[in-house]
Structure formats: C-alpha cells, structure tokens
C-alpha cells in the first residue's frame, strides 16, 4: 500500500490490524523481500480463513540453496548492490518454500510465467508465482 498513497486500506504486514480469519485470498506480490518475512508469514496465516489461499511472488534464485540476507547491510546503496533494490532486505533461494511452510502454509502449486500469461497478467517472463494454502 505504500506505493499507492491513495490506497483504501493500508496495513503493516508484520502486524496486520484485523481480526483472525478475515480473508479467503491474499496476494503478496513482491512484498516479503521488504519486511520481516517470518512475522509477515505468521500474520498472513492468522488473517486467512481455514483453507484460505496465499498467492505470492518474490525475487528468487532457484540455483541458490539458501536465501541471502544480512542484517548488517542497511544502506540503500549497499542493499541495491546485494539485493538488487535499495529497499530489499533479502534475495530468496530455493529454501523460500520451506520458509513459508514453516509458518504453517502448505505449498499447493507454483507456476513459471511464460507465453501469453506474461502479457495478459503483466508478469516477468520466467517469474515464479507460488500458491500456498492455510492448512
């Protein structure tokens, strides 16, 4: 919501100010790399109804076994150098799935954008979309 200052609702993903089990579907498109993803994942799980769906996209390098993050990297310039963008705090590796599952989500599916979907949905070619479910 910080990108769109005119948003109807602005929420802190690390401390979502709504009651438990309020949403059927949540789309988190390129936000988890900006926040404490453990806190955010727990909050997303809390506000989803049982069986609710989390659709998620993050910058990920599948060839990396582990997520790259370093709390000592704090300047915008250094974050841009290390994480590709000045407000990112990590670059995910193949362990991304397990990081989200550790919060209680079940990985239902994942898609790699290609062909007509790239244009139709405004995705980057080769971008991963993950679909998790509250178990």
Model-derived regions, located:
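Conserved aromatic-histidine-acidic binding/catalytic patches
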Residues: 32, 36, 84-88, 120
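A broadly tuned preference for mixed-charge, low-complexity surface segments
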Residues: 19-31, 80-82, 105-112
């Amino acid at each position: 919501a910080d990108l769109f200052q005119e948003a109807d609702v602005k929420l802190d993903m690390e401390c979502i100010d709504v009651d438990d089990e309020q949403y059927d579907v949540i789309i988190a498109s390129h936000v988890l790399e900006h926040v404490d993803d453990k806190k955010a994942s727990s909050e997303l799980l809390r506000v989803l109804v049982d069986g609710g769906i989390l659709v998620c996209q993050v910058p990920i390098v599948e060839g990396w076994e582990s997520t790259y993050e370093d709390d000592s990297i704090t300047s915008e310039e250094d974050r841009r150098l290390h994480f590709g963008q000045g407000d990112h705090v990590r670059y995910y590796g193949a362990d991304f799935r397990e990081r989200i599952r550790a919060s209680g989500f079940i990985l239902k599916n994942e898609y790699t954008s290609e062909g007509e979907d790239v244009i139709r949905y405004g995705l980057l070619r080769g971008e991963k979309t993950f679909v998790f479910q509250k178990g």
